[in-house]
Regions:
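Nudix hydrolase/Nudix homology domain
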Residues: 64-66, 70, 76, 103-108, ...
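Conserved Nudix-box catalytic region and its N-terminal flanking loop in Nudix hydrolases
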Residues: 21-34, 46-86
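A short coil-to-beta-strand element that immediately follows conserved catalytic motifs
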Residues: 95-104
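Short loop segments at secondary-structure junctions
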Residues: 12, 41-45, 56, 124-129, ...
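Acidic, metal-coordinating catalytic segment for phosphate/diphosphate chemistry
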Residues: 1-44
Length: 182
């Protein structure tokens, strides 16, 4: 399990050397980061499916909602890629091959108590075993690209964790390119 210190960041997205923060240290002026990994697989029609995780009912944020395949905060001293690899292992029991993890971008997000950068990755799934390990996920579900595109238009209607429009635009541009490559 990762430590309770999160890596602190400068406003330009560069980590602050030697500065880790606990949840109680967070203020409106602090910036931390989260790594998001979206798993996708080639569908039978040549497009792509996206793996969603239903958050467990006992988690603090967005219980019962569908969300990113695996995600979590960047721990002190970790890189965003390290955090992505760790979270995939912790949440869905999958060891990612770093050569197949593709970084698609980072976006700032202002929260009510603090700010964070979201480092977004995609990963092509090839049938490796999946297992909801740490109790944060209650279910896993593969969703076709077109269905996911519809879900993000009305996230509350389908209990999908809402993200910024720019976030979904970044993700859907990359997944759309993959889906058209068939």
């Amino acid at each position: 399990m990762h430590n309770d210190l999160w890596q602190s960041y400068h406003p330009n997205g560069v980590p602050k050397q030697g500065e880790g923060l606990t949840r109680k240290d967070l203020t409106k002026d602090t910036i931390v980061a989260a790594a998001h990994v979206w798993l996708w697989r080639r569908s039978s029609d040549g497009g792509c499916d996206i793996l969603l995780q239903r958050r467990a009912d006992q988690v603090k944020n967005w219980p019962g909602y569908w969300d990113i395949s695996a995600a979590g905060h960047v721990s002190f001293g970790e890189t965003p890629l390290d955090a992505a690899l760790r979270e995939a292992q912790e949440e869905i029991g999958m060891t990612l091959d770093t050569s197949r993890v593709k970084f698609i971008g980072s976006l700032p997000k202002r929260k009510s108590a603090y700010s964070e950068f979201h480092f977004v990755y995609i990963y092509e799934y090839h049938g490796e075993p999946l297992d909801m390990v740490d109790g944060e996920a209650a279910a896993l579900r593969w969703v076709p690209y077109d269905t996911f595109r519809q879900m993000i238009e009305q996230p509350e209607d389908v209990m999908l964790v809402p993200h910024q429009p720019l976030y979904f635009a970044l993700l859907m541009e990359e997944l759309g390119r993959i889906s058209r490559e068939s």
